[in-house]
Amino acid sequence: MLSQYMEEFEQEPFEVGEFIERLTWRTNNELQNSEDFHPVALHDTFIQTIKDLKILQEKQQSKCERLEESLRQEKESHAKKIAKLQERHQTAIDVFGQLDEKINSVAGKIMHLGEQLENVNTPRSRSVEAQKLLNFMSEFLAAGPVIVNDIFADAARLSEAADVIQKLYAISQDLPPGNFAESKRKIEKKYDEVERRLIEEFATAQKSEDIERMKTLAQILSQFKGYTQCVDAYIEQSQMQPYSGKDIFIGIVPLCKHHYEIIQKVFANPQQVMSKFILNIYQLKLHQYAMTKLEDKKDEEKYLRTLYELYSRTLKLSTDLQIYMSTIDDDLLQKLTQQIFIKHLAGYAEMETKCLTAKCSTELEKFYASKKHQKTATTKGFRRNMEVLIATRANINIAAIEDYGGETFLSEELAINMLQEAKASLKRCRLLSNETELPGNAIKLNDILLRFLMHEHVDYALELGLQAVPLAEGRVFPQLYFFDVVQKTNIIVHLLDKLCHTSVIPCVSNTPKYSDYVFKKRILMEQIETKLDQGLDRSISAVIGWVKVYLQYEQKKTDYKPETDVDTISSAACLQVVQNLQPVIVQIKKCVDGENLQNVLTEFGTRLHRVIYDHLQTMQFNTAGAMCAICDVNEYRKCIRELDSPLVTQLFDILHALCNLLLVKPQNLQEVCTGDTLNYLDKSVVRQFIQLRTDFRIIKNTNYLKGIIE
């Protein structure tokens, strides 16, 4: 039972209430009739359980005491062991200190002994070396030919021979020239021979890329006067093979990267050697390559493209190679690049302007030749003005208007070609012009573009377009092509603006030339806008003039004053006018853009309103005719809705309200006149329309018009 209690106590978490519940449940289950409650049995069970728990507590207490005693004894044992270990550790520290003192003492004696040995050995070594050199010197001092020593004849002992001859050469430089001239000549000859053999050996090692051997030989040669020959030999042999076929630029950077790693390992002064390596590429390889490519100047366009490509690729190459240059030579590559191209850059600007002029002129000639058109000097509108003056005063048409079959003589393709040529020229200009000449050169190129594209092409087309606009108040509906001229002009101007912002302005911004550029462009745009406005005004006048003449001759008096009742429909003249105006509105909306579109549509609508208003003022209206007039005005209103102009819509709404004055009964005139639409109009306008009624003489003396015509 005690073991069962222990199992329950060891469960986590232990709940006293649950333990008592389980004990009560077990007691009830042990009885025969478990449904009855037996308090006595339960009491006995609790008493027995309490006794068992006390016994269990005593056992556990005894077990704890034994474990605590065992722990105390083990702790004392470990403490004694630690104390003994500490004593032994201290003893070891003392012994180590004594040993360290002895080692330092022995080391000091050894160093002292080594110094003494070195002091004794150094003079001896020098003496041996001096004796060795004297033996070699005696051979060179002896009369007759030099007896070739083994050290100079054995290729395996080349390094040793180089050391000897270098020292002998240094000694010989201090000998007086008189008695020792022959000996000095022999030494110099052998010196040159050994030096040549070293360079040849270095070249052989370079071919097999034996880095260690090259490094050793370079160190030896660094003591010789021909060390630069070693560097030159390395550079010459490294750059002997073609870099990359016909395109020299592709192989230069990989070549430099490869040899930079070798130079770093081989030479003691790698930065100077690498600078000379790159210098040789620029002064020999690149310079010769550029001269070959640029020797033919007959095809100027090809020459300029080649110059730009070579110069830009050389600049990029300089940027890529800058990491291999020392800080002292920071601007060396830039100077080398200028030396290569200086002759070509000097005459660049003149050739560029000449080439662009020729290209633009050729494009213009090809365009007009394709149109079979011979350019002629325009009369600047003088003839046109005379025709208008004579036609107005004499009421005759003295000559037919030449409209060239609707040809605008404007070409977006031509403009794009010219702009592309100018863009390429400006791109070259930004790269090939120096900082002080760039703004002036860019302005010259821009002037050429403006001359050919805007003055000789667009302005010429505008002049022809202005002359081709039909005269106003013609009886035949005018064929209008100037709107197409406007559309193409706008496209060309937008393309020009885009080019200027991307290619011209960056060249002249923040310079005195910028104000010159802005002034020229403003004058040019003002001239273009003036002619566009003039042409649009003439075109609108031609259409509105035709409406005026057409209504004047085709609108019958009986349309608005029929003698018999007729169907209430729009007049034929009105329908014809609307039919002709709708395509014009569509064409205007297609060809004009921006704020100009709204201005043109509003101007068109207001002039149309004035013509129709004046036309209605010439008519007399009875009731049936007034209905017809209202139908006509409604047709006009439908037409002008496409103008999207609030002002024009309002004008025709008022005109519609005025036409209602022709229809309403006399007793309702006061009410209509005081309505929202007509209330703010001048009474004279209202009075003029009321006077158009056929019954006006009857009603003018009645009270119906009181306050209106007074």
Curated annotation (Swiss-Prot):
Coiled coil is among the record's keywords: yes
Alphabetical keyword list: Coiled coil, Exocytosis, Protein transport, Transport
GO terms of biological process kind: exocytosis; Golgi to plasma membrane transport; neurotransmitter secretion; protein transport; symbiont entry into host cell; synaptic vesicle docking; synaptic vesicle targeting; vesicle tethering involved in exocytosis
Example GO molecular function: beta-catenin binding
Coiled-coil intervals: 44-96
Alphabetical list of InterPro entries matching this protein: Sec10-like (IPR009976), Sec10_HB (IPR048627), Sec10_N (IPR048625)
Keyword Coiled coil annotated: yes
GO CC annotation terms, alphabetical: exocyst; presynapse
Transmembrane segments: none
Domain of life: Eukaryota
Function: Component of the exocyst complex involved in the docking of exocytic vesicles with fusion sites on the plasma membrane.
Subunit structure as annotated in this protein's UniProt entry: The exocyst complex is composed of Sec3/Exoc1, Sec5/Exoc2, Sec6/Exoc3, Sec8/Exoc4, Sec10/Exoc5, Sec15/Exoc6, Exo70/Exoc7 and Exo84/Exoc8.
Family: Belongs to the SEC10 family.
Record protein name field: Exocyst complex component 5
Native organism: Drosophila melanogaster
